[in-house]
């Protein structure tokens, strides 16, 4: 099964590039199948990692950035792939 972990944070105004750089620098304890980093208006950064594992498996996640860098807590979601029926 493929599991996708999504990590999304919103930077303090004007610090989106710093948050993006911070997210890119973070190493995970295990290497995912795939990792992509995105940015969006409003100084938001999204990181998605894909894993070949069970939905409830323990997986490494990006930590919370320094409170001076973000305006709110990180949002995290876990999804599993489904096949078209």
In which residue ranges do the predicted regions lie?
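Glycine-rich beta-strand-turn "strand-cap" elements at beta-sheet edges
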Residues: 1, 33-46, 62-85
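Short glycine-/aliphatic-rich beta-strand segments at the starts of folded cytosolic domains
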Residues: 2-11
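Hydrophobic pocket/interface hotspot
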Residues: 7, 19, 23, 35, ...
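Short amphipathic alpha-helical segments
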Residues: 11-34, 62-65
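Helix N-cap motif at beta-to-alpha junctions
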Residues: 12-15, 50-56
């Amino acid at each position: 099964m493929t599991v996708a972990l999504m990590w999304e944070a919103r930077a303090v105004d004007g610090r989106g590039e710093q948050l993006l750089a911070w997210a890119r620098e973070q190493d995970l304890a295990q290497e995912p199948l795939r990792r992509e980093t995105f940015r969006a208006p409003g100084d938001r950064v999204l990181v998605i990692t894909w894993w070949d594992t069970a939905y409830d498996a323990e997986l490494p996640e990006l930590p919370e950035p320094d409170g001076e860098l973000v305006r709110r807590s990180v949002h995290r979601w876990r999804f599993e792939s489904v096949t078209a029926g």
